[in-house]
Amino acid sequence: MDSHSIDLLEELVIASKLLAAAVLGAVVGYDRERHSRDAGLRTYASVCVGAALFTSIAGHLEDVSATSRIVANVVMGIGFLGAGIVYKDSNSGYAKGLTTAATIWCTAAIGVAVGLNMFVIAIAGALLAYFLISLHHRKWYVRWKHRIKQPRNVD
């Protein structure tokens, strides 16, 4: 066996990380899937798995600094994906896709955390991201958002 190969047990550990990343990414994408958004469960799970895979592979390279370079490139790649998602709505003049881009970026970070064996951080990140995505369906949040956007009378 050459120095670049890993044994079957290590490959199974990486495979279990990928499964964990898929589940966590799916958790983040669930609310979007439920409300028929373009980027949903499959997109978020795929981003999380990809980030975990790149990071896990980097952990087995001989060059220790390769991990940080690969993580940086994952962030950059997701940035390009996010840039393609954000657009300006010609009717309203508002930017669209910002939340999608931000949560896809966050989901990549969750995948990186899984790839680096930071499972508690990954789970906390996934749950927090899901909560933030689902806020716009909460009545209290909608009322609060509407209230703060109302102009105040200044006498």
Q: Can you name each region flagged by the protein language model?
A:
Residues T43-C48, V74, K96-W105:
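Short hydrophobic alpha-helical membrane-embedded segments
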Residues T55-A58, G82-Y87, C106-G115:
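Generic transmembrane alpha-helix signature in multi-pass membrane proteins
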